[in-house]
Amino acid sequence: MSQHPEAIAAHGGQLVNRVATPAQREEFVSKAEFLPRVQLDERAVSDLEMIAIGGFSPLTGFMNQEDYDRVVSEMRLANGLVWSIPITLSVSEEVASSLQEGGLVRLDNPAGDYIGVLQLTQKYRYDKTREAINVYRTDDAKHPGVQVLYNQGAVNLAGDIWLLERSSHPLFPDYQIDPVASRQMFRDKGWKTIVGFQTRNPIHRAHEYIQKCALETVDGLFLHPLVGATKEDDIAADVRMRCYEILLEHYYPEDRVILAINPAAMRYAGPREAIFHALVRKNYGCTHFIVGRDHAGVGDYYGTYDAQYIFDEFEPGELGIVPMKFEHAFYCTRTKQMATTKTSPSRPEERVHLSGTKVREMLRRGELPPPEFSRPEVAAELARAMRVQVLA
């Protein structure tokens, strides 16, 4: 039986809100000059934001050692709730030694602006190699997620946080839709079943195919591209957003899709990040989540369908969101349409396999992706953006 989004509980039962009230903000600002400060990097800023708006419910702050250890080893919080990615605030030994457990810590963004507060309850050291092997399935420093891990501080700070205020996104204010708002939008549209789609690439024809396959069985599609920190060679968020707008304008039913930004940072943790992405979309009100080929993967670190198999390690009720697993879609030159091996009679040589990586490689060579790869309007926008980048 279908449920309205208002009946879809956030992970852990309640949607978290750690945005300071006006009174709290006034109090924190009055204490600013007296508080020790920690400067956050781009990823920590996005984590702070996602905790505050409820995207990372049930987390109310950065993880303590008990939660951290169990997440790394078992993909569960200390209370047994499924959670697959450590959300931590790491600092150097020197910075950690200057902070007192039990006190407040001022959190600044990379520009030095005061954006949040941490109630410091615990400082603890952790094993980076153990985290790398368990979370990323590799200790290779060339892996982008492992590289970030190895470069961060040796001590984690734990405790509840407050975001001083929810400011508009500088690039995409119209698409900044927090979990409270997305749930309301789903209710207003009367959607009972909503499928979420995570992406950090412009949508190519294979993505479009699996999204529309999913949309045949649910009420709405929540297209939720990630605009937080990504790899240097990933296509810039502003370019990707223009591509999404173009695609939705020409090729999708207007009343069945909502486009919103996901401010989180990529970890490139493959299977574990697939679980994480699903739980985040559950917090936004989704009932289903698309898991395709090599979800959240990078290079050859993960098997093609490892990110689908990991969902089988949990009881369905533990996750509270339904994974929709799709095979690798391709363009079939025999039938002249998108398909998978489940629906196509084609031989391997009649299949044009698509990927964001291939599209990026073609653009760098100055080639326009063919219509089998990308819709013409999207390909033209990508090519225009690449020319601008070369000239800059």
From Swiss-Prot:
Keyword list, A-Z: ATP-binding, Nucleotide-binding, Nucleotidyltransferase, Transferase
Pathway: Sulfur metabolism; hydrogen sulfide biosynthesis; sulfite from sulfate: step 1/3
One of the Pfam families matching this protein, by short name: PUA_2
CDD domains: ATPS
Known EC number: 2.7.7.4
Taxonomic superkingdom: Bacteria
GO function terms (MF aspect): ATP binding; sulfate adenylyltransferase (ATP) activity
The UniProt record lists the keyword ATP-binding: yes
SUPFAM superfamilies: Nucleotidylyl transferase, PUA domain-like
Catalytic activity: sulfate + ATP + H(+) = adenosine 5'-phosphosulfate + diphosphate
Gene Ontology BP, a term: hydrogen sulfide biosynthetic process
Keyword Repeat belongs to the record: no
Family: Belongs to the sulfate adenylyltransferase family.
NCBIfam families given in the database record: PRK04149.1, sopT
Name this polypeptide is given: Sulfate adenylyltransferase
Species the sequence originates in: Trichormus variabilis (strain ATCC 29413 / PCC 7937)
Primary gene name: sat
